[in-house]
Amino acid sequence: MQDPEQFSIESILQRLKERFPTEADEISSFFDWDLVHKFTVFLKEKNEAGGFFSKRDSEEILDRHVLESIYHVYRITKKIGSWKGTQLGDAGTGPGIPGFFFRCLKEHPIVVLIDSQKRKLSHTENFVRSNQIDGVKFQFIRAEESKLSLNYVTSRGFIPYPYSIEAICNLLKINGTYVPFLGKHDMDTNLEKKVLSYSGFKLEFSEDLVPLEFLGMRHIKFLKKVSSPRHGYPRAWKEISKESKGANGKDRID
């Protein structure tokens, strides 16, 4: 569905009720809608300058990026319970999607937006600075080159899953959790087990996000870091990227 002519808190909440009629009230209680509105307007206004979205997505920012992210954040928050004292990183964040929507929670973690490309994320850095928004940090670095010791990491539209596990493995502390945003259940399970093993992770559980079916199949996985990665991992981005191009499972949201 195309975006409303003008974004307002009212138009965003109206679409929220249309898309998630049984959960809208609970979802609305989780978020600071003034901040959601400001960020949504920013995404639209800076889209062309920052090259945030494709031509199709530029007409459906609310459904395909804002509400999709908000629903993911809502479901993850229900599982986590409290974000108090935690740090969450978003790998390959682009302009801050989905990571910034964790900052839009009323009770939010410290959010670290991670991307090696400054073209998109520098606009978000300016947005955060000009609006004096605290609790957001920026890392202009490749995920596999960074060691941040975070509690949680997310990704959406990043390197294809399961190779994204390898790419982010050093971002998390031991017992930290990686929650990739995923599409169809079409990955090679043997490959997934292999990457989980050498990256030091185990699968805790997987959850389908049925209310997002208007966008296609969506699901999330909760992956716990149980040990340091094996020697030699994570590999350089060029190696991970080359191998991932033959992967069946995709982290990209279509």
Curated annotation (Swiss-Prot):
Lineage: superkingdom: Bacteria
Enzyme Commission no: 2.1.1.-
Main location: cytoplasm
Keywords for this protein: Cytoplasm, Methyltransferase, rRNA processing, S-adenosyl-L-methionine, Transferase
UniProt cross-references to Pfam families, sorted A to Z: GidB
UniProt key word Cytoplasm: yes
GO molecular-function terms, A-Z: rRNA (guanine-N7-)-methyltransferase activity
Cellular compartments per GO CC: cytosol
InterPro entries: rRNA_ssu_MeTfrase_G, SAM-dependent_MTases_sf
Binding site for S-adenosyl-L-methionine: 92, 143-144, 156
Subcellular location per the Swiss-Prot or TrEMBL entry: Cytoplasm
PANTHER family per record: S-ADENOSYL-L-METHIONINE-DEPENDENT METHYLTRANSFERASES SUPERFAMILY PROTEIN (PTHR31760:SF0)
Protein role: Specifically methylates the N7 position of a guanine in 16S rRNA.
Family label: Belongs to the methyltransferase superfamily. RNA methyltransferase RsmG family.
Listed name of the protein: Ribosomal RNA small subunit methyltransferase G
Organism: Leptospira interrogans serogroup Icterohaemorrhagiae serovar Lai (strain 56601)
Taxonomic lineage from the root: Bacteria, Pseudomonadati, Spirochaetota, Spirochaetia, Leptospirales
Gene: rsmG
